[in-house]
């Protein structure tokens, strides 16, 4: 069997910390040169760049605003520096907690622009390049378990992630003929700055409502992304893979809750 081999050139958005940094580092360990983006944390992006270069790979850095209609230009810019593009990891995103009744249109649009519009524009630019080169490729979208199940106080976030999950399937159908796979990774609660935790918290925080009893570690997300980016995943496309410690299995245990405090934001 001959498996198409895409270029070992990857772009990871939002790689200045957390899951993005872990993914960039693991891809570098797997032999990829990496382009990374950041929004405001330039120092964090510099640390990620140093970590990639310590692994003997090239790394280029660019600031990116996912709410801009021109955000796809960043993908083109990094791809030009890399000399091509074989893998895009749409990792960057944002979150917001609050009642839907209080959600302003501006905040709603900001959430959808960051978590859905921006990833679409990045994927579109990446796919065009992959089609043009004719060597296939991989697109991995980081969604959330809330692509699949709702969360109180996160209407805009859940809507955007659900949309990104459906976009993953639509792109997978359209791009399969070009040997481009498109998949999603749906993390549960992961110990990152976005969730107010440090990486070691993954193994010292207690989570009774999760079958594993703890949050996830960024390396556990990066490992799945790296698999999907590899030739070993060449027959897997259009799927969303929850990496949540079994959290989504717990729905039937809602009757075990002692009170209705979960309703309060």
Model features per residue range: what roles?
Residues 123, 160, 168:
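Active-site helix of classical SDR
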Residues 144:
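Residue(s) in the substrate-gating loop at a strand-loop-helix junction
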Residues 99-100, 107-112, 206:
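Substrate-binding pocket helix/loop in short-chain dehydrogenase/reductase
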Residues 176, 181, 236-238:
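Short, small/polar-rich loop/turn modules that mediate ligand/substrate recognition or access, typified
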Residues 128, 173-174, 234:
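Alpha-helical segment proximal to the catalytic Tyr-Lys
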Residues 16-17:
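Conserved glycine-rich cofactor-binding loop
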Residues 149, 237-265:
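Short C-terminal tail/terminal secondary-structure segment
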């Amino acid at each position: 069997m001959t498996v198409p081999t895409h270029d070992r050139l990857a772009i990871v958005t939002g790689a200045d910390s957390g899951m993005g940094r872990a993914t960039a580092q693991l891809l570098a360990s797997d032999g990829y040169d990496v382009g990374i983006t950041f929004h405001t944390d330039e120092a964090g992006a510099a640390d990620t760049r140093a970590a990639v270069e310590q692994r003997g790979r090239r790394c280029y850095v660019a600031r990116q605003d996912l709410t801009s209609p021109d955000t796809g230009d960043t993908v083109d810019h990094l791809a030009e520096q890399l000399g091509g593009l074989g893998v895009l990891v749409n990792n960057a995103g944002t979150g917001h907690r609050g009642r839907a009744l209080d959600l302003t249109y501006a905040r709603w649009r900001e959430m959808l622009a960051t978590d859905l519009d921006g990833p679409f524009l990045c994927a579109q630019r990446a796919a065009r390049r992959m089609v043009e080169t004719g060597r296939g490729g991989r697109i991995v979208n980081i969604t959330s378990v809330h692509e699949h199940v709702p969360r109180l106080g996160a209407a805009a976030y859940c809507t955007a992630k659900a949309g990104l999950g459906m976009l993953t399937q639509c792109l997978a159908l359209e791009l399969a003929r070009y040997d481009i796979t498109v998949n999603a990774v749906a993390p549960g609660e992961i110990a990152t700055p976005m969730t107010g935790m440090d990486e070691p918290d993954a193994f010292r925080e207690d989570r009774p409502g999760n079958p594993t009893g703890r949050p996830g570690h960024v390396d556990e997300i990066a490992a799945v992304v790296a698999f999907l980016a590899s030739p070993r995943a060449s027959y897997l496309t259009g799927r969303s893979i929850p990496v949540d410690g079994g959290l989504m299995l717990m729905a039937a245990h809602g009757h075990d809750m002692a009170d209705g405090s979960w309703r309060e934001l």
